[in-house]
Amino acid sequence: MEREIVSIDAGWWVVSEEHKIWLPAGELPHGDAASLGLAGSSGSRIGEWQGEAVWLIRGSRPDDMGSLRQLLDRDSALFRLAGRGIQLAEFFRSHQWCGYCGHKMHNSRTEWACLCHHCRQRYYPQIAPCIIVAIRRGAEILLAQHTRHRNGIYTVLAGFVEVGETLEQTVAREVMEESSIKVKNLRYVTSQPWPFPQSLMVAFMADYDDGEISIDRKELIDAGWYRYDALPLLPPAGTVARRLIEDTVALCRAQEENGER
């Protein structure tokens, strides 16, 4: 999997360490290893984009180390591949020693895994499933400002799946815990790898069923029902939250134009 990068290796380059990524001029570097000063590094091919290889090099550069969020408005396939590189880099960084016996780990030569030659344990990259749900009530959508978002953005509700839960149970629990309402008519929409740090966002739409909004102030600053044509500041394009909101707005508009509720 990992080998020495030679001068003629070319394509797109994910250079990552501690959740940061090398973004000279705000872009994912593209070109051959020689011109980018990457020849001689250890690297792995992690995918392909626009017919060219995407490479991962685990490490940092003196300048221009930034956040993957800077690529949110780029092609979604490129964003996912860059996110894959960041997650793999962090996985290998955090699995240098075996959690069972404490001996040094070795990277597998055939798959994305770390191996312990002493106790034979095998570790794979962990992914944390997370639900995210847009809730509609007539021509309104439930939006909330989270405590972790101090930029005024309002978004839909989300939360991590707990041990032993189904995705449907997680939706019901998270919505109740954060807003004190019940939902019905749950529909799967899409999913999005979200490497902040290693989530898989599983997106749903749902309809309001019962209850009055009462927020968990450890999680939310504010929450309310907003008409589809009078929305607050929203998450950026490229996020699954924005996709859910836009899909709900389209549904609200279509049903209102048809005289439905």
UniProtKB/Swiss-Prot annotation:
A motif (Nudix box) lies at residues 159-180. GO terms for cellular component: cytosol. Its cofactor is Mg(2+); Mn(2+); Zn(2+). It comes from the Bacteria. Residues 125-248 form the Nudix hydrolase domain. Substrate binds at R69, E111, Y124, Q192, P193, W194, P195, F196, P197, Q198, S199, A241. Its EC number is 3.6.1.-, 3.6.1.22. Keywords: Hydrolase, Magnesium, Manganese, Metal-binding, NAD, Zinc. A divalent metal cation 3 binds at E174, E178, E219. Pfam families: NUDIX, Zn_ribbon_NUD. It catalyses: a 5'-end NAD(+)-phospho-ribonucleoside in mRNA + H2O = a 5'-end phospho-adenosine-phospho-ribonucleoside in mRNA + beta-nicotinamide D-ribonucleotide + 2 H(+); NAD(+) + H2O = beta-nicotinamide D-ribonucleotide + AMP + 2 H(+); NADH + H2O = reduced beta-nicotinamide D-ribonucleotide + AMP + 2 H(+). One of its GO terms (biological process) is NAD catabolic process. Divalent metal cations. Mg(2+) or Mn(2+). One of its GO terms (molecular function) is NADH pyrophosphatase activity. A divalent metal cation 2 binds at E174. A divalent metal cation 1 binds at A158, E178, E219. Belongs to the Nudix hydrolase family. NudC subfamily. Homodimer. mRNA decapping enzyme that specifically removes the nicotinamide adenine dinucleotide (NAD) cap from a subset of mRNAs by hydrolyzing the diphosphate linkage to produce nicotinamide mononucleotide (NMN) and 5' monophosphate mRNA. The NAD-cap is present at the 5'-end of some mRNAs and stabilizes RNA against 5'-processing. Has preference for mRNAs with a 5'-end purine. Catalyzes the hydrolysis of a broad range of dinucleotide pyrophosphates. HAMAP family: Nudix_NudC (MF_00297). This is NAD-capped RNA hydrolase NudC. It comes from Erwinia tasmaniensis (strain DSM 17950 / CFBP 7177 / CIP 109463 / NCPPB 4357 / Et1/99). The gene is nudC.
